[in-house]
Amino acid sequence: MRRYIIASHHKLAYGLKDTVDFLTNGIKKIYDVNAYVEDGEKPIEEVVSELFASFDENDEVLVFADMMGGSVYQKFYPYMSDKVHVVCGINLPLTLALVLESEDTP
């Protein structure tokens, strides 16, 4: 199964996920990770770890990150593999294109 994670500083990930869900009628399960939103929130490392722990080891994961090399990107970098891909510089057209791509497409 292909999993989708949108990750960003502040609330960009929430807004992008909400818009993709609206335009696609929520046909895919998309997770959003919004870092550094409030004091006292769960550390992003913990959020990312728990999210990956909830996936099957055979799942393919596409992570959409806001900035290459940024602190959010760095939390996902250790998970990159043949099955975990991080796409940086996210925007709505790119995210829609990849989410709507067939899961059979490599």
Task: Give the ranges of each region predicted by the language model.
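N-terminal loops that bind phosphate or other acidic moieties
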Residues: 1-106
